[in-house]
């Protein structure tokens, strides 16, 4: 039997997820950003405009993840794997001190954006395990390949360039998705406010900027991307773009690999509506 998720639920989830994964949370804010109008940032944003990030799949995947605590735990566990791999590789780049631009970029934002520990704690809080799906294993393998990629053996300073693609896909998603998906998730699952650390800002040096002047942090993120891309050839930048396209696909696979994708999304949509109604009733009375 095939399940069809009502269009209203799909539109609601897609609009929420588009805010969470694309830099353009609104037309006005997108126009206000300047550093994504040129350089590597512009080239990476093209992947969004060309539809390589499947908003419908992400929206349905989000709904499925809030259908019950077990599914949420599985989703967060599978996300923990690529986050942990990426952040480990980035710290290794800093330790090696070969890719100077990337090292400076990561040192500047790491305490604000790292999420692997938060994901690990959330999975434990939900009573899940940390065993990722095969899709997450493929994602991790891609990250490790990206971390070791160089222009050639004679250019160790280019090692890790392709990690910029994974930072773009994951961290811009968190910056916009954290505050917008946290509350719906908690309402659908009946969790206390701010109980999921993945969706709350880190206690980093730019915490207040992220909370109250998020666009400034996004501008800084784009600026650092452009600085890293400035010394690359056009061919090298294109490899970063292709890696971002791959990362979008690998991310979608995490949501679609398990059985019951559409039926779970339908149940999650009902849980989300129910959670909102309960919240409204509690405020009213």
Region spans (language model):
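Metal- and O2-centered redox machinery and metal/ROS homeostasis
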Residues: 2-285
